[in-house]
Amino acid sequence: MADGLNRVHYNPSTAQLVEFALLRGEGELTANGALVAKTGTRTGRSPGDRFIVKEPSSAADIEWGPVNQAFEPGAFEGLWARVEAFLADKELFVSDLEVGADPEHYQPVRVTTQYAWHQLFARNLFIIPEEFNRQDKPVWQIINAPDFVCVPERDGTNSDAAVILNFAERKVLLAGLKYAGEMKKSMFSVQNFLLPAQGVLPMHCSANVGKDGDTTLFFGLSGTGKTTLSADPKRFLIGDDEHGWAPGGVFNIEGGCYAKCIDLSQKNEPVIWDAIRFGTVLENVVMDEHRVPNYKDSSLTENTRAAYPLEHIAQRKEDNRGAEPHAVVFLTCDVSGVLPPVSILSKEQAAYHFLSGYTAKVGSTEIGSTSAIQSTFSTCFGAPFFPRPAGVYAELLMKRIESFGSQVYLVNTGWTGGPHGIGKRFDIPTTRAIVDAIVSGELKNAETVHLDTLNLAVPVAVPGVDTNLLNPVNTWSDKALYAEYAQKLAEAFTKNFAKYQVSDAIRNAGPKA
């Protein structure tokens, strides 16, 4: 992009970007030093406006449909050119960054943004390398033009905004969107497409490591506890959202964290609380008259966020990498109150529950979502971000688990004693105690009871957890009603799973309707 008519700031520092954002009226400074920015009507991702260019080099490997919508190559060229022309006389911010903290599996990316705060977000969430693109790989380009207005009749979009990935040209176009999470999830989708061809499993998970080098992964949708549970004062954080699992180890795809802020408290989430300071971007967080953030205020959205670099976390793995995981945790948020707080899975059950991705949308990250909590099945615990057919990722997971001998657990961070509205949600200290027992290895060979309808093995005891909580039927006053809800959930699993072509061993590993 030419910088004759416009001013272009290359690789600007955090302080410069905060200054630019304030001078340009893009945000305000909070009492804790963070920058607050508002994203307008779109306070979450816009899945209906996400497209992938349908071109010969990648078309056969993508699962086309409502998640991966096809976009014509010619329409993309025209729209890219119009956005470039729109930005030609604008002040711009450009950084050379990387996605993937692995010397073999990184992707270099040049990020061009119209807004200073979007550039700060990109520099917080992507990796700022000591030496850019050491292997001289072809460079991806992201252009983010939030003030460009798409015209569906002219541009081939579904609305006034679009997110479009082009694998052949290594381009990502974001137009008409202020919500910054689209940038990180776009490059996550890119890596989710590229990594399997290199024998690497891309994962929507968080990861941390103990003092002895033992790695734990936490899979889950937004709001189920990935960030909270991986930010453990007793362990070292690798990352909170996106990772690759290669033979020999796991690596963070990012260089920062994107934590949910709703109801954030210093007591329950000290690591996240302390990370919010100068350089952090707060999205759609409301402040009082003294500029103190009010994390309880959801008047703009339930999906309030903090974007900060990993350097803001004291206890972290500085190379953003770890050994292969001894423990893998699938976080599910069960709104029916039926699932136990922890189950120990066989490798076939792991494949079944990975493909099912049963959970709930909690303070959903997608626009148009209400604050109502709905159950959902999200393949691989992140269906919106995986371009290839689900079986590709499930096979890679099975391969890695078998090869290393990882133990997989299903942990319910949702409700017990009744469905949402009647029962109560498991509190964070209870879930932390369960996770402590998992990472210490105490549950790997624990004595279990079998729940027939759910087809799950549940430990009879977990240190620090009320034994009555472990078998969910004990927490329901009406046992017959529990059995009815359990049967309904088993039927929902079976109905959802019918679409998958898998072995009988995997199909039979699910609940028994």
Curated annotation (Swiss-Prot):
ATP binds at K185, H204, G220, L221, S222, G223, T224, G225, K226, T227, T228, E269, R305, T431. It comes from the Bacteria. Substrate binds at R45, Y179, K185, R305. It is found in: Cytoplasm. SUPFAM superfamilies: PEP carboxykinase N-terminal domain, PEP carboxykinase-like. CDD domains: PEPCK_ATP. Its EC number is 4.1.1.49. Binds 1 Mn(2+) ion per subunit. Pathway: Carbohydrate biosynthesis; gluconeogenesis. It is an enzyme of class 4 (lyase). Its main location: cytoplasm. Monomer. Belongs to the phosphoenolpyruvate carboxykinase (ATP) family. This is Phosphoenolpyruvate carboxykinase (ATP). It comes from Shewanella sp. (strain MR-4). The lineage of its organism: Bacteria, Pseudomonadati, Pseudomonadota, Gammaproteobacteria, Alteromonadales.
